[in-house]
Regions:
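Formylglycine-dependent sulfatase
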Residues: 2, 16-261
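Sec-dependent N-terminal signal peptides
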Residues: 3-13
Length: 261
């Protein structure tokens, strides 16, 4: 991994004169494989994600972690999650092991500080770095993303309305979390349009609790179910994430950054 990070740093440094490409990584939380139209849904509507798939690359054979927290540990460290000690969500003390046949290995709930993050590597290569959303790798002290390579970082998870943020950030009453995070992401892009930037936008959606904007739920209220896809509220949550993708894409187009991102 150290060699890989070194090569990454060298590559971006060597081509700095050519303006290194911007990098945006958008993550949806607990989104099912077939919960977007491009992967089979005929009930949920994801036109912006579908457009990205049509213009880019779809991964149809790949390794992924079993749930949320190890996925994030692997993404940030560039290592298999098991190498970071993050095997599952939370500590093993959250389960009653007397009711389970197997006890897993001890699990850490924060990405160890000796793991170099992709944000730290890109920052060394001259990138502006921003993260807005669900971090889930530790928020206290040096574990907060602002201490792990991100120039700007706002963490939020737990609720889609009346949410809290770390650090505390003011927002209009009734604002939906996905819209709030997207607004911060768009602002970050606009302020860093003249330099290479790395934007990490990990949405809390579509994780429970199931909370959606009423106007989006109304779109799906009378739509006929297709197989197991039938919940207007969940559909509206997916639509909010898709809207976020659309807003980010539109911002790149407006700033003429799409071809270098």
């Amino acid at each position: 991994m150290k060699h890989l990070l070194g090569l990454l740093f060298f590559a971006f440094t060597a081509h700095a004169a050519d303006r290194a490409p911007n990098i945006i990584f958008i993550m949806a939380d607990d989104l099912g494989y077939t919960d977007v139209a491009t992967f089979g849904s005929r009930y949920y509507e994801t036109p912006n994600i579908d457009q990205l798939a049509a213009e880019g690359m779809k991964l149809t054979s790949h390794h992924h972690c079993q749930n949320c927290q190890p996925t994030r540990a692997a993404l940030m460290s560039g290592q298999y999650a098991a190498r970071t000690g993050v095997y599952t969500v939370g500590g093993i003390d959250r389960f009653d092991w007397s009711m389970r046949p197997l006890r897993p290995a001890d699990n850490v709930t924060e990405l160890p500080l000796d793991k170099t993050t992709i944000a730290q590597t890109l920052k060394k290569a001259g990138y502006a770095t921003g993260m807005f959303g669900k971090w889930h790798l530790g928020e206290k002290g040096d574990h907060h993303p602002a201490k792990r390579g991100f120039d700007e970082a706002i963490v939020s998870m737990g609720k889609h309305f009346d949410f809290s943020t770390n650090p505390k950030t003011e927002y209009p009453k009734g604002e939906y979390l996905a819209d709030f995070l997207t607004g911060k992401a768009v602002d970050f892009i606009q302020r860093h349009k003249d330099e290479p930037f790395f934007l990490y936008l990990p949405h809390f959606g579509v994780h429970s609790p199931f909370q959606a904007k009423a106007e989006l739920m109304a779109k799906f209220k009378d739509k006929a179910p297709v197989g197991g896809h039938k919940d207007p509220e969940y559909a509206a949550m997916i639509a909010s994430v898709d809207e976020s993708v659309g807003r980010v894409m539109a911002t790149l187009d407006e700033l003429k950054l799409a071809n270098n991102t």
